[in-house]
Amino acid sequence: MGQKIRKCKNCGRYTLREKCPVCGGVTLPAIPARFSPQDPYGKYRRLAKKG
């Protein structure tokens, strides 16, 4: 399995193809944000979640 999941730039759907099968748009690698134990924005995210 050498393929990685990709996300369409136009419609936001996920696929393994270079071109979106739904809208025909360009797809980009869907790379998640890097995890850091020393999360500098964790405090703000928890405050926003609390409301």
From Swiss-Prot:
GO molecular function: snoRNA binding
Pfam families: Nop10p (PF04135)
Keywords from the UniProt entry: Ribonucleoprotein, Ribosome biogenesis, rRNA processing
Gene Ontology annotations of biological process type: pseudouridine synthesis; rRNA processing
SUPFAM superfamilies according to UniProt: Nop10-like SnoRNP
GO cellular component: ribonucleoprotein complex
Gene3D superfamilies associated with the record: H/ACA ribonucleoprotein complex, subunit Nop10
Function field: Involved in ribosome biogenesis; more specifically in 18S rRNA pseudouridylation and in cleavage of pre-rRNA.
Family the UniProt entry places it in: Belongs to the NOP10 family.
Protein name (Swiss-Prot/TrEMBL): Ribosome biogenesis protein Nop10
The organism of origin for this protein: Methanosarcina acetivorans (strain ATCC 35395 / DSM 2834 / JCM 12185 / C2A)
Source species taxonomy: Archaea, Methanobacteriati, Methanobacteriota, Stenosarchaea group, Methanomicrobia
